[in-house]
Every structure is written in C-alpha cells, then in structure tokens.
Amino acid sequence: MKIWTSEHVFDHPWETVTTAAMQKYPNPMNPSVVGVDVLDRHIDASGKLHSHRLLSTEWGLPSIVKSIIGAARTKTYVQEHSVVDPVAKTMELKSTNISFTNMVSVDERLIYKPHPQDSEKTVLTQEAIITVKGVSLGSYLEGLMASTISSNANKGREAMEWVIHKLNAEIEELTASARGSIRTPMAAAAFVEK
C-alpha cells in the first residue's frame, strides 16, 4: 500500500473553486477522462448537495503493466461521490476505481475549504491510497502509480485554473450583454425624448 498526499492553495474564493470542480471535465489538460455521467444528484434536508458520478477514462499504460494485463490502452471507470456543504463551506470528494479492482485499488479523497487566513483563497487537500494486489512487483507499481497520480494532480490543478478562467470569461460576457440590453432601451428612450 502506498499513500500519496498533497496540499494546494487556489487564489480564488471557495465558491468559485467548487463551481469549477463540478465542471472540471472535459478539459484539455487531462484528455484521458473521456466521459462523465451523473448517476445521482440531490440536496439533503440540511442543504448539502450530494453527487454520484461515473468517470470513464482511457489510459496508455506503461510497458510493465501492458505485459501484466495484456493491453496497450484500456478504458477504466471510476465512481466519484461528492458532498458540498454551502454553510460550512466544504466540498469533499471521494473516488475509487471500479475497473481492475482484482489487481489494483486507488481510493482518492479531495477536500476544498476556504483558506483560514484569506477568504479569497481556497485550500485543496488531496490523499490517494494505492494498493496493487497479487503481483510480485506490487511495491514498485504502487510507487509508479503514486508518481502518475502526482503528475495528474498537477494537471488537475491546471485544469481547475482553466475552468475558472472559462467561467470568469462567461460571466464577463453575460455582464457585457446585460449592460448592452439595459443601455439599448435607455438610449431609445433618450432619443424619443429629443
């Protein structure tokens, strides 16, 4: 078993970061995620948003893994459960693979919280527990997978920034459009009065 952990601070408020987290896929930084399906989404009695999603991924595999499972590329599935608490301002996301569970399990947990000293920033804490089963090189493969998870976490943070930029651009466009539609009737009224 290998445990990987990381912490990152986003220079954006919690509301922005959690909105981006829910819209993270697809993105150009991680093209291996080829599909996201929402299986269930509801708000509980306390106002928390619960989501259960299925992520479809397609990976190119290292040569040692290819020889073990006999494939060069493989489609895998990950189930993801998230809970967003708008009152406590926390988002917890747990994911686990549901493909190849007889060979490997990857359990990941992400927590988004406002930065304790700066409400305009958000702290992301990540943890992944990797277990390779029934292979003599299990420890080596777990280390290799931890390295891949670390690289993908960096890509994930880049993707979050990309989504946030995209969301901000959409907001600016809507704001400009709304201002234009407000000015048009006002300009017409001013023209009629002359």
Swiss-Prot record:
Residue positions, PTM Phosphoserine: S46, S51
Top-rank taxon: Eukaryota
Keywords, sorted A to Z: Phosphoprotein
Pfam families linked: PRELI
Gene Ontology BP annotations: phospholipid transport
PROSITE patterns: PRELI_MSF1
GO CC, one annotated term: mitochondrial intermembrane space
Domain called PRELI/MSF1: residue spans: 1-172
GO MF annotations, alphabetized: phosphatidic acid transfer activity
Family: Belongs to the slowmo family.
Protein name per Swiss-Prot or TrEMBL: PRELI domain containing protein 3B
The organism of origin for this protein: Sus scrofa
